[in-house]
Amino acid sequence: MLFEKSVLVPLGADETFALITEPDRLRRWQTIAARVDLRAGGGYRWTIVPGHSASGTFTEVEPGKRVVFSWGWEGQADLPPGASTVTITLEPSGDGTIVRLVHDGLTDEQAASHGQGWTHYLDRLAEAAVSGDAGADEWAAAPQELDAIKSAEATLAICQLVLRGIPAASYQNATCCSEFNVSQVAEHMIGSITFLGGAAGAEFPQTTATTLEAQVAAAAQPALEAWNRRGLDGTVKVGPNEMPAGLALGILSIEFLVHGWDFAQATGQRVSVSDEVAGYVLKVAQTIITPEGRGGSFANEVPAGPDAGILDRLVAFTGRAA
């Protein structure tokens, strides 16, 4: 059984090919994180929504024309990586390009569910082709059965969306983090990502990324992939200390969501987060941030107000005035 769908986008074939294959472009409409080795025999891993990552191998790559890759979901026995095939063909049409997607090797039930998914994301592809970014993905907003991995992926998506909205001219804007501008807060966050990713065995290739969003994404992708491989059982070594694995990874959710709020405040943006995700991160913060830890990494808690939402309560707990 197969699913097939076409969409017309107002871009040339080369621009469209970049939009469907390059990690920086994929994050604008389909993925939270993407690793891509774009060659025949090269692998990929795309985190589509929190807790759901597809992976496989490219079998055909014709830049500007066609890409074929195996497809499956990590951790799913009914459609594991490599169990099906996706073919995307690009055909020039007037001033635009027709994107034709065929997903083969599915059961009837899988074709129906993947049809819903591909329709959703091809609509977002068309939107990104027009506006440059399809914006927040409603499917990623409130993951079911939240755990430390899903929370980290959900909050990363939120933070990256804010970072994509920051022009380079605003990188020096002051933030509510004392004496740190936007660029410096991002640098601090990347340090936290590599430190905590290293606790799960992540390796970080050199990056040529220039935007803050791309730099954060280049660190976050291997970090979260390593945590997915390792899982949340047992403890990990964080500096000189042993910590429960889930608690150590939970620090990244605080980093992504709270610093995403910092970036938004510094650049005139708003953070959109579900109560489920914000509430999960608040509980993690209340576990990690102790009175003894105040005054160093975290300022003293400030009043949040009786009508404060969960995100406002979180940032107030970390010493920020909403």
Question: Language model features by range: what are they?
Answer:
Residues 1-35, 143-144:
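Hydrophobic ligand-binding cavity/cleft-lining segments
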Residues 16, 26, 44, 58, ...:
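Hydrophobic pocket/interface hotspot
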Residues 25-29, 35, 39, 105-107, ...:
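Structured surface interface patches that mediate subunit assembly and partner/cofactor docking
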Residues 29, 79-83, 111, 274:
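Alpha-helix N-cap/helix-start motif
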Residues 34-40, 49-98, 103-106, 229:
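Hydrophobic-ligand binding "helix-grip"
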Residues 42-46, 56, 181-184, 196:
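Short beta-strand segments
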Residues 188:
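Conserved catalytic neighborhood of penicillin-recognizing serine enzymes
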